[in-house]
Amino acid sequence: MFKVDWDLGPVSKSASDQTKESRKEKKRKKGERKNVGDKGEKLNEKVLKKAKSVTTNNSLKSEIKKEKSVPSIKEKNKGDAKHTKLTSLQQKMKDKLDGANFRWINEQLYTTESDKAVQMFKENPDLFDIYHAGFRYQVEGWPENPVDIFIQHLKIRFEHSNAKKKNNIVIADLGCGEAKIASTFRKSRSLQVHSFDLVAPNEHVVACDIANVPMADETVDIAVFCLSLMGTNWQSFLKEAYRILKVGGLLWVAEIKSRFSDKSGEVFAKELPKLGFETKSIQLQNKMFTLFEFKKVPVHGKCEELPPILSACIYKRR
């Protein structure tokens, strides 16, 4: 009989069992790889978000820093103002210089003939602005401006009463300055204003010598001299007004009282009939100036020369 030893060691697995185990192992490893991949993606997302946040914050900080480094318009203007603002001493010196320039121009206008004044402003146009800036400053201290009184008279006496008439009232503002009368009535249907001065500061004004106005004979209803009988040949201004006025037309004059030889203007009213102007009214109540209204009447023969009844208006030096 054969003796059989049953201790054969580990029993080998069949081929089918080995195949099943191999598949399970592959699935397990695949699952592990997937889990690792998911964790890696999540980790990458977190890292990217954090990196993006850091980048954004850094860029914002950079932009804020840039904005702070660039001054605003307000700060820039404030900085410029520091450089352009005059000190009180500089301002006083500037005011003194402006006042001296105004007085010098004013003296030239009153002590020379009008043709020389025209030439002066042609050569130096800025002088006209300097003069009128100084003149505005002087007028601010007056109780009222005579041009405003003339404007009120035009509104009350002529603008409304002439509204329905076909023909306009023609006004010549002689020595108009900045043409306040023309600008006031620029839309009026009943008043037509022609403005003349040595320089044309705006569209309303025609530059000319007041002794030679570019208007036809007897075409004007009202001629106005508002503080503008300047120059040593002021009588030629009045003769020119007589030429352009219609017979029966009105001459309005406003002048500083200190210019008249009698310090009131009554002697002026008595003398003007020699030039063909009949006195209609004279207003003496204002402390600064006198207002006149004359009417043009026919003159037979040559007009007489007036005596020296109107002196130059020279401002005192401070």
Curated annotation (Swiss-Prot):
Pfam families: Methyltransf_8 (PF05148). GO terms for molecular function: rRNA (adenine) methyltransferase activity; rRNA (adenine-N1-)-methyltransferase activity. S-adenosyl-L-methionine binds at H132, G175, D197, D209, C226. The keyword S-adenosyl-L-methionine applies. One of its GO terms (cellular component) is nucleolus. Its EC number is 2.1.1.287. Residues 33-48, 62-83 have a biased composition (Basic and acidic residues). S-adenosyl-L-methionine-dependent methyltransferase that specifically methylates the N(1) position of adenine in helix 25.1 in 25S rRNA. Required both for ribosomal 40S and 60S subunits biogenesis. Required for efficient pre-rRNA cleavage at site A2. Belongs to the methyltransferase superfamily. RRP8 family. This is 25S rRNA (adenine(645)-N(1))-methyltransferase. It comes from Schizosaccharomyces pombe (strain 972 / ATCC 24843) (Fission yeast). The gene is rrp8.
